């Protein structure tokens, strides 16, 4: 057998009382893997049993080790009746299958029950012995590493970025099987959890096989999603970017061949952070200029990649030579030829990365998106999911064709999502069309002369802004000017992108969160009629969302959006759209014009006075925003910049060559043109409401900033004080006769009040910034709106001078104080710094109510996780430790960022991908919807932290709550919630601890810059 799994059950504690007569429990444990089950002895009359079982050994294939989870069930022994279930623990074995990962899983795991929540803890030790397997026909992919982070992980360098990998598996949903009518809710929930865990493991294994076929060893930007299609079935799908990664182990590796010798890198060569100041506080993301392009989905028949001649990656004749002038033409042609050779063999040249190694991105062409409305049908054969594959293939082919139309050969920042209601499913995909540097895509394909030309032809701070297409044959009408930085090539007047801001970008002032919110009512319908109505609404919703983004961007006095994420959610009676992005002012782009309001009835005196008043308010708002975000661009004469192009005659020529729909051209005409001001024409009530909504967005309170990217543009002086939080708000619409205007007002108020409540609760942390703000909107029931927000609050030093125009700054100040956290109105995060006397209170805003729901006090749970750590006890600074070892941290930190400010990640232990179901039949007794969700999310955090601590980790980075599906039945006092979370388990070391170690150890024995060879 290629693998032997060994499990030992040590002890349990804080078990619930199962025998009312004695107020004790007769507990035993069943250990199951695959079809084999072992049992421990019954430990009589104790709430803290000590089993100390023998080693249970499972001899299995490595394929099963990847697919199957280890199931540990704790039961109460009953002599005369069936044994009562206390709870279960699912342990993923995959992290033990990496050669450089953990060798043992050991710790206290919360015992989870889908009805009662956490019911005590169990101490388990798991080991795996793998045998060498040289079978060329094997179906396992052991050794392929998975990372949730959408950038090259710390401690690694990218040798080759192979490209896009995807897979999906389907099955019947146990919740909708006939047997569900006769089994208990607990059995149904556990069957669902078990099936999803199996499908998740199978999906990961299949993607790993594809990576091995591409000769890679890792998947970066791994995104797994669950499509709950009801009676149609259950779909688990995932996308990612296949890479070949090398572990950095020596200082010499910090100057790779793929980085410019003149570029000083404090971190890893292809790390997201070439900036020494932000090496732990921000990833590097060379971004390219983007012109926003919404495109409603069209229907394509599935074809093989070899037959897609119309979607070839070869740009149109002349495309790519105009903007570079006489010098850039031959260079761009050579670059495209080299890059195309590396990509032409790939069916979909997509990357799920949003942050990139320095020099990978050459140009960005625009945001490309596609949507399609489908009718769900029952999955007849789970082993052959051709229908769903064909759906996604159509979407990807359309994205590919849009990128080609923009003169680009790749799509970066690519993501996919679905929205399902009854029988209708909306498939959505979006990304950023880009031109990539070929040396990252294939080994040995780029000659040295081309590498030199690439570095010479990319101006620092503005190269990504230059248009990749021919200015005389543009794919859409646009207003171009010469770059305000290098003054050699053309840039657009506005830039939209789905990726993060590059560290070398020259930004004026600070950034801010910009959101566009939209609701549209629709009639109730069934099947095809419903799908048709949704299809007809989608283009208009996309147009209005785009218009809102443009208006709000200009109202802020900014000219670029990064991290754009658009959601279209479908319900029974409405459609909702939510777009989030981070607005910035790029110095390379022209100063945005103002907003001018024009009315339809100029003879009406009172109406003109009203218009004039609104115009004054808008002008005042723009001036205040420029002052608030410190936007003071340097003045540049018009003679140095050049006149805008194209001229009207050239524009008519490009319109004739335009192959896209006339609707898209009209949409872009509204946002581009040779006018100093952006004109808003008020011709009806809806237009008036749009203008009012622009003015009702209140700025954040003094000392607060917010963004949906990892790093707030314009701020570099981060401290080590972070607080992650999740907030879920469910609102039931009261009125049955809502109009679109009233619905929009309610939705805007819901989102604004949610942000205001966060600012209020975090008021003692000022000055701080809410980073990686992730809004998710769903319509679980008719007239029910659910908004979920995940973000992290990071403090910064307001006394340190901000350096916004240089990508490389001095080392940022680091602070490990927890004083502000003690002053919080409520505990936000169950995490602490390395100071044992001052632990953080409880886990997030959610562990506060976990005391009465989980059976374990929050204080005890904090101690539980601390003792579960496999790294020992005590203060790291006061004990002797080997160089570059990981510190002892009392509680596992959680953050949606790919880094931890003021610290270095030394080791990745594996991916955490967990799915939980919680159901209750006593909703009111548990505090209603708020109390139920509050306790459940707290329990999810506790279980995630326990699994990370058992692996020997002390943090979860790139954390994301991908799904939070809530359903309630108030009349029956019932509720159910499904949550899917994922992230990367890591070991990190504080920079202050590294300094202590470097002072105690000889320089030859400890390399702080390597931070990370921990041998196991």
Curated annotation (Swiss-Prot):
Keywords, sorted A to Z: Calcium, Cell membrane, Cell projection, Cytoplasm, Cytoplasmic vesicle, Lipid-binding, Membrane, Metal-binding, Phosphoprotein, Protein transport, Transport
Biased composition, class Low complexity, residue ranges: 290-318
Keyword Cell membrane: yes
Post-translational events: Phosphorylated on Ser-197 by active myristoylated kinase AKT2; insulin-stimulated phosphorylation by AKT2 regulates SLC2A4/GLUT4 translocation into the plasma membrane.
UniProt-annotated binding residues for Ca(2+) 3: 78, 81, 84
Modified residues (Phosphoserine): 197, 200, 260, 293, 295, 304-306, 323, 643, 657, 659, 661-662, 671, 817, 869
Example GO BP: vesicle fusion
Sites where the protein binds Ca(2+) 1: 19, 26, 76, 78
Cofactor: Ca(2+)
Phosphothreonine modifications at: 317, 601, 666
Gene Ontology terms: cellular component: cell cortex; cytoplasmic vesicle membrane; plasma membrane; ruffle membrane
Biased composition (Gly residues): 319-328
Keyword Protein transport on entry: yes
Cofactor note text: Binds 3 Ca(2+) ions per C2 domain.
Molecular-function GO terms, alphabetical: calcium ion binding; calcium-dependent phospholipid binding
PROSITE patterns given in the database record: C2 (PS50004)
Subcellular location(s) of the protein: Cytoplasmic vesicle membrane; Cytoplasm, Cell cortex; Cell membrane; Cell projection, Ruffle
UniProt region (Disordered), positions on chain: 265-330, 636-668
Tissue expression profile of the protein: Expressed in liver, muscle and fat.
Binding locations of Ca(2+) 2: 19, 76, 78, 84
Residue ranges with Polar residues bias: 274-289
Alphabetized InterPro entries for the sequence: C2_C2CD5 (IPR037785), C2_dom (IPR000008), C2_domain_sf (IPR035892), C2CD5 (IPR038983), C2CD5_YbjQ-like_dom (IPR056430), C2CD5_YbjQ-rel_dom (IPR056431)
Domains (record comment): The C2 domain binds to calcium and membrane lipids.
Role according to the record: Required for insulin-stimulated glucose transport and glucose transporter SLC2A4/GLUT4 translocation from intracellular glucose storage vesicle (GSV) to the plasma membrane (PM) in adipocytes. Binds phospholipid membranes in a calcium-dependent manner and is necessary for the optimal membrane fusion between SLC2A4/GLUT4 GSV and the PM.
Stated name of the protein: C2 domain-containing protein 5
Protein species of origin: Mus musculus (Mouse)
